[in-house]
Regions:
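Transmembrane-helix bundle of Major Facilitator Superfamily
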Residues: 2-177
Length: 177
């Protein structure tokens, strides 16, 4: 990867374009990470709705990090084949399709398939959070960009159960997805 960034001004200052690009990627990653833990409070309600036991319902939580983890090394291959923009939009589309499938799931199998799609999109989004600042910021500003991304991304899994519980209590589990 080159040390030359593609959107930096000659004076080395951070531009609104750079901030916007990284903010969009970090927001996508935040939502993907939030989705990893937001389902925890919904498990009892989902168990009741689909008449499944706890060991079966646990797949809702387990499948996400499993598939997401598999997709991270796959994304290295994809980054070599496609632009970061195309990968971001593709991963976001896969994540959104999975989300829609989960929200409309008529049974547990469709819910799991939706979670697999969400996780596949998430697994491609996560590496982009590291790659995009390297492409967008000059060397001397990359640490700042990565630090900001890290702060936002660490909040996703932390607030997931709280947000999930509040949404479930107010609107139901399908809205939360």
């Amino acid at each position: 990867m080159s040390d030359n960034c593609t959107v930096a001004p000659a004076n080395g200052r951070i531009t609104g374009t750079q901030i916007s690009i990284v903010a969009v990627v970090v927001l996508g990653a935040f939502l993907a990470l939030l989705n990893q833990t937001v389902m925890s409070p919904a498990l009892p309600v989902i168990m009741s709705d689909f008449a499944i036991d706890a060991s079966t319902a646990q797949w809702i939580m387990s499948i996400y990090p499993l598939v997401s983890g598999i997709m991270v090394p796959v994304s290295a291959f994809l980054i070599d084949k496609f632009s970061t923009r195309a990968l971001f939009f593709g991963a976001t589309l896969v994540f959104a399709l999975g989300t829609l499938l989960c929200a409309a799931a008529p049974d547990f199998l469709f819910l799991i398939i939706g979670r697999v799609l969400q996780a596949a999109g998430s697994g491609v989004l996560m590496p982009l959070v590291s790659v995009v600042p390297m492409l967008v910021f000059p060397v001397e500003k990359r640490g700042t960009a990565m630090g900001m991304a890290g702060i936002v991304m660490s909040a996703g899994p932390a607030v997931g159960p709280v947000v999930g519980g509040a949404v479930i209590d107010t609107y139901g589990w399908r809205t939360m997805i």
